[in-house]
Amino acid sequence: MSKFDSIRVISFDLDDTLWPTMQTIVEAERQLFRWLEENTPELARQHSIESLRAHRRELALANPGIAHDMNLTRELHLRELFAGLGYDTALAGAAVEHFQQHRNRVFPYEDVRPVLERLREEFILVSVTNGTSEVEKTPLAGIFHHSFNAVDAGRAKPHPAIFELLIDRTGAVPREVLHVGDDPARDIAPAREL
């Protein structure tokens, strides 16, 4: 009997495992900046995509308790910048929503969907990500039985909270779960801790 015979659940990281990430994030940031140019022109004049990224990083470092929630961090950093320039801070929510629409426009690797469809016939499939992609709004909609992100878990990988959540929600025990990810430190190490 192989140790794989007991597998009931296969979990997958998303970004850079099932699809390339950088092209999507770069485009989402570009689309957000266009939105800022139209809705908060003075902010767009004073900043670049790079300076906005740096400001957001500073906010995340100063607030480690929310750093796992990238959209909240993005919204708070925009609220801060909007307030400083006299813009309605409520616009930040709309800006993040615009970013998220473009963040969900991912391009899975060619063989991903057919392989996942086949695996779905035999296993419970779960997506786990630190990212903000909403799987049901991507080309992989309808594939996963469960999808969890760092916000759901309250912590980002490599903390094992997301894997603990997976175990709790699927009713599986650790030896029944196989995790597939691209990052040994953020994906493989915390999955092994269980």
Regions found by a protein language model. Give the residues of each.
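Glycine-rich phosphate-binding loop signature in dinucleotide/nucleotide-binding domains
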Residues: 3-5, 121-122, 169-176
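N-terminal helical cap/lid subdomain that shapes the substrate entry/recognition surface
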Residues: 3-110
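Substrate-recognition element of Asp-dependent hydrolases with the DxDx(T/V) motif
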Residues: 90-150
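Short, acidic/turn-prone active-site loops that include or flank metal/cofactor-
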Residues: 150-156
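Conserved Lys-Pro-Asp/Glu-containing loop-to-beta segment of HAD-superfamily phosphomonoesterases
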Residues: 156-189
